[in-house]
């Protein structure tokens, strides 16, 4: 097994990246380390570009119509119980369109189908030997996959507005990783139990398994935040935290610490799973393309 070290350049990217971007970049960087040779060597040679562009899909949301719905799916709006969701929800986009209609799908998010489409674009890029498109599609695929590993990307209560928990999305996805990422075990190696990439014969099943696991975690994401907010009171739940040259009102460092403890490693586990899934889908796309040199 190879020993993993995050380069200084990548570390600086993580430290100085925009609000909400550091987790995506970290996942892409770690996913590269999980690849087997010869794919590892190719991705490593383009490591800085892939990590830098891990957030391109987010940047497009503000200027490209049709991009925003690729990052989520509000499963709760379809009225399925969790068990029924696993058994009966249409996993193929054509089936879902026929049942619910195009407008409903777009309004509720097309996250898993966006992953599938981007996966096949990556396969095509590998087959054609188009290096620029390989890098672009790999970066986008990693971003969409990572988003589906965030529980709040699978619910219409995306930012806690429906339950009076505004700001919970950035708390879970950004504030906790920024504060505690140094304690996370995120890359495979000699001293890690984390798996390297493997080939997924059925990429669609892999995508939906990750999505369902995220959706199952929503209750705990919301419950522990609500419990701590009630316990700590408004004055200690929030604080003005310095970010760059500004101060932003967000959950206090003490609240974030206790929330981190209550979740018992949940954010770390979802990041670990995202890294494994991203690297495995990159690898699977290369295999499906015929393992081009």
Tell me the role of every PLM-derived stretch.
Residues 17-140, 156-293:
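N-terminal, motif-rich segments that launch catalysis or mediate targeting to/interaction with membranes
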Residues 1-26:
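Bacterial Sec-dependent N-terminal signal peptides
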Residues 146-160:
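Catalytic Zn2+-binding segment of zinc metalloproteases
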